[in-house]
Amino acid sequence: MLDIKSLSASIDGKKILEGFDLKIKPGEVHAIMGPNGSGKSTLANVLTGKNGYEIEGQVLYQGKDLLNLPIEERAQKGLFMAFQYPLEIAGVNTNNFLKTSLNTIRKVRGQKELDSLDFLKLVKTKTKNLKIDEKILSRQLNVGFSGGEKKKNEILQMTILEPKLAILDETDSGLDIDALRIVSDGVNALRSKERSFLIITHYQRLLDYIKPDFVHVLVDGKIAKTGCGELAVELEKVGYEKMGANK
């Protein structure tokens, strides 16, 4: 699914990732944990095509070079990113945004586009399953949303688009327990042998609900340690300094 080899990334002359390696197979859930400034969000930005980085190394997605693909093509090929700070887009209706996004993906997949009625049935089912208020659909995209509402909307998008690889960049940040469960329920509902997840988080609590296959500790732009879910529990007890992070 995703094969990262010797990835280095710099911005404004400062190297953030250096010699980063990671391989994610179809159906796997990987969690990346690390202290602030370790390169977690930089990794997500590089994978999703954010501009401004000087990049070296290789990233293969489904066997093809990911780094040369424009942002929109990455999304069309099934790469999804749930942002830590989702953008507000005034004048764009949430329901229309979701419908357009889904039909764009369906067209690329060679599937028939959904009309308004069929999409409405789909999105109502998704909001009900996630316990999200349907009123969110009639509002402007993320405008005036609370932090929790924005994160819920990201997960709603994910469940509608059904990506092949979903990246969650600290989606659990600032969430209360109810919103955290909505996020985890959305991920768990999509888990399958064909779909993979890369969960980037600072804390272990999200991994109480989403059981990862692998946990990686990112320190100074490199993976310092890899283990199973128990590694996240260990981190909560001993902290990142024990893994080689600077104070």
Across the structure, where does each feature detected by a protein language model lie?
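ABC ATPase NBD Q-loop/coupling interface
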Residues: 58-74, 142
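Conserved beta-strand-loop-alpha-helix hinge in the C-terminal portion
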Residues: 214, 218, 222-244
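Conserved structural motif at the start of ABC-family nucleotide-binding domains
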Residues: 2-4, 17-19
